[in-house]
A protein has these predicted regions:
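Start-transfer (signal-anchor) and selected internal transmembrane alpha helices
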Residues: 1-30
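Transmembrane catalytic cores of multi-pass membrane glycosyltransferases
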Residues: 52, 57, 184-197, 201-266
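Transmembrane-helix motifs of polytopic, lipid-linked glycan transferases
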Residues: 97-117
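Short acidic/glycine- and proline-prone juxtamembrane loop motifs at membrane-interface regions
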Residues: 138-146
Length: 266
């Protein structure tokens, strides 16, 4: 079979291009759903605008009526600023654009990493599509879209580091510093790191894991943990993040934590 001309081959869309464009425009065309299915976007934009206008990040509540003066932990302040900036430039379309870009990049990285790890393109495309379908329930113009993106970047970095494809241990505390100021689910990064540490312990007990790798993994964890305190609320951020997932009332009334309801039509 004759191969196409190099220029033609370059111009023809690749599976990764189709995947990225498909996810991106699926979110863009479903823009109204991205913010109508959740009431938090207005609050995020308001807080972001306050930070942009005043140049300060409030640590005490100035937005509510009943809790004025109480401690306020803005665990999403950086993403709120980004959403506010996007809103100033493009209105609500800007916020949809940010969410769609994060979603498409997340799925693209998953696909590319699957290819790199030796999976057939068809298998990688199937898995990436499956991830897309499963995650689509959470396609909203909210800060948690940054966590989707950061989880993939974090796992990508750990996989390369664990397989000795990279020695950049600084990558993790830098990424964690951004993550911890963007969304409260930064704890997911430590959960993922924990799985690699458990695997290293198992390999070490079998005589296959090196002491140096173990030291590096624990050092990554220590440095990444240390930078989590570099945020406007300091140690209180951990209390908010851990407190939320351990709050039975909150988790029982938040869709993300509920079991799937197969009787819903939407």
């Amino acid at each position: 079979m004759k191969k196409p001309h190099p220029i033609l081959a370059y111009l023809l869309p690749q599976p990764r291009d189709i995947l990225f464009i498909g996810v991106f425009f699926s979110m863009v065309f479903g823009g109204t759903k991205l913010f109508n299915n959740d009431g938090d976007l207005g609050r995020h934009i308001t807080i972001g605008n306050y930070i942009l206008d005043t140049g300060t990040i409030p640590t005490y509540d100035i937005f509510s009526h009943t809790m004025v003066g109480e401690r306020l932990v803005l665990h999403e302040w950086l993403s709120q600023v980004i959403f506010a900036l996007a809103h100033r430039v493009m209105g609500l379309s800007g916020d949809v654009f940010i969410a769609a870009l994060l979603g498409a990049l997340t799925i693209l990285i998953v696909y590319e990493e699957l290819i790199k790890r030796g999976n057939f393109r068809l298998v990688a495309l199937f898995v990436a599509t499956l991830v897309t379908v499963v995650s689509s329930v959470h396609w909203l113009a909210r800060p948690h879209m940054f966590t989707f993106f950061f989880v993939v970047l974090w796992t990508y970095g750990l996989e390369r580091f664990y397989k000795n494809e990279s020695k950049s241990s600084w990558y993790f505390p830098v990424l964690m510093l951004i993550w911890v100021n963007t969304h409260g689910a930064f704890i997911a990064g430590f959960v993922v790191l924990g799985t690699y540490i458990v695997d290293w312990i198992w390999e070490f007990l079998q005589g296959r894991g090196s002491k140096e790798m173990g030291k590096q993994l624990f050092l990554i964890g220590l440095l990444s943990f240390a930078v989590t305190f570099i945020n406007p609320s300091g140690v209180y951020l951990w209390g908010t993040s851990v407190g939320y997932v351990s709050n039975e009332f909150m988790t029982s009334h938040t869709v993300e934590y509920l079991s799937p309801d197969f009787h819903e039509k939407d």
